């Protein structure tokens, strides 16, 4: 008898607890969180982006190639907001040129194991891909690859060298 009463009380309380817990706002995520960044950037108007036409395809592609490298902090795969304009322009270009394909390479510095660096390099490439897809780019246009620490652009054991190697590079195919 007592257990039936407890069960009834719990049956009544559980939906109330669930309702109240869902009605309170969740804690805001760190502004460096990649999901928050994607959400904020996706909400921006596409009208702000440059309009690309067939007339200036080569010229536009050359401009985009100049901003083809995204750098990352140590042990991090989140795209920094300072790359938003370049990535937004690239997304707009790819949306207007659906036959254009890109490959995103993920790279790391030499610190860490080979296995971890391959994983982190892939996460970096995937973060850039996810950002572009959030802007409407087809996943059929993007491939990713991780090179880990195997293709450094700077050699040395100082932060100056390390920071140049923590990157994703966009290759136009």
Swiss-Prot record:
<dbReference type="InterPro" id="IPR050330">
    <property type="entry name" value="Bact_OuterMem_StrucFunc"/>
</dbReference>
<feature type="domain" description="OmpA-like">
    <location>
        <begin position="59"/>
        <end position="173"/>
    </location>
</feature>
<dbReference type="InterPro" id="IPR006690">
    <property type="entry name" value="OMPA-like_CS"/>
</dbReference>
<feature type="signal peptide">
    <location>
        <begin position="1"/>
        <end position="21"/>
    </location>
</feature>
<keyword id="KW-0998">Cell outer membrane</keyword>
<comment type="similarity">
    <text>Belongs to the Pal lipoprotein family.</text>
</comment>
<dbReference type="InterPro" id="IPR039001">
    <property type="entry name" value="Pal"/>
</dbReference>
<dbReference type="InterPro" id="IPR006665">
    <property type="entry name" value="OmpA-like"/>
</dbReference>
<protein>
    <recommendedName>
        <fullName>Peptidoglycan-associated lipoprotein</fullName>
    </recommendedName>
</protein>
<dbReference type="GO" id="GO:0051301">
    <property type="term" value="P:cell division"/>
</dbReference>
<keyword id="KW-0732">Signal</keyword>
<keyword id="KW-0472">Membrane</keyword>
<keyword id="KW-0449">Lipoprotein</keyword>
<dbReference type="Pfam" id="PF00691">
    <property type="entry name" value="OmpA"/>
</dbReference>
<dbReference type="GO" id="GO:0009279">
    <property type="term" value="C:cell outer membrane"/>
</dbReference>
<feature type="lipid moiety-binding region" description="S-diacylglycerol cysteine">
    <location>
        <position position="22"/>
    </location>
</feature>
<feature type="lipid moiety-binding region" description="N-palmitoyl cysteine">
    <location>
        <position position="22"/>
    </location>
</feature>
<keyword id="KW-0564">Palmitate</keyword>
<dbReference type="InterPro" id="IPR036737">
    <property type="entry name" value="OmpA-like_sf"/>
</dbReference>
<dbReference type="InterPro" id="IPR006664">
    <property type="entry name" value="OMP_bac"/>
</dbReference>
